[in-house]
């Protein structure tokens, strides 16, 4: 899913995760909802809201991790780390290295679980037929991996959520 900044990609994904759960389809991965407050300041959007930061919500557990804070706010509040990966990449957002590590560990857990659940000799998804789609075997149950979002740190710097791209 791609699109311009602030057009509702994460809100759409949140709705999709809910709809799929209602249909019995599990979603794993990460959602990245913004931390928004009403504002009339210079950083307010056209709807009168200001984005202060970004959380990461780990799926399926729903664990919420404070992930990123707008750089100017992080500098003013004090948690900005000049040695962090995000600072070295000169991003507009301050992302705590521990938060990156936690989300990467989550994707590593997803990969390990998927590898353990795959039957020996299983064909890649692209080579499977629809046969067995109704199987009660959890390793064959439908599911969706959500990675919200990949940005400059991942795509141009080879950092950030590297486990999501593995």
Regions picked out by a protein language model, each given a short descriptive name:
Residues 9:
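Conserved lysine of the Walker
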Residues 16, 162-166:
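Catalytic-core regions built around general acid/base machinery
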Residues 76-114, 142-156, 165:
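Phosphate-binding/switch loop-helix module in NTP-utilizing enzymes
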Residues 5:
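The conserved Walker
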Residues 14-86:
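N-terminal phosphate/diphosphate-binding loop that engages ATP/GTP or pyrophosphate donors
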Residues 44, 112-141:
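Intrinsic disorder/low-complexity segments
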Residues 1:
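Hydrophobic anchor at the beta1->P-loop junction of P-loop NTPases
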């Amino acid at each position: 899913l791609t699109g311009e900044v602030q057009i509702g990609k994460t809100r759409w994904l949140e709705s999709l995760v809910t709809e799929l759960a209602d249909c019995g389809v599990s979603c794993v991965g990460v959602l990245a909802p913004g931390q928004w407050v009403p504002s009339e300041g210079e950083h307010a959007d056209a709807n009168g809201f200001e984005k202060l930061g970004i959380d990461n919500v780990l799926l399926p557990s729903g664990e919420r991790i404070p992930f990123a804070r707008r750089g100017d706010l992080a500098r003013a509040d004090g948690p900005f780390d000049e040695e962090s990966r995000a600072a070295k990449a000169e991003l507009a957002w301050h992302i705590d290295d521990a938060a990156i590590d936690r989300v990467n560990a989550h994707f590593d857990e997803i990969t390990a679980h998927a590898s353990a659940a795959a039957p020996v000799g299983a064909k890649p998804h692209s080579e499977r037929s629809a046969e067995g789609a109704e199987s009660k075997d959890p390793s064959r149950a439908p599911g969706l991996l959500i990675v919200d979002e990949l940005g400059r740190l991942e795509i141009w710097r080879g950092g950030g959520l590297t486990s999501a791209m593995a």
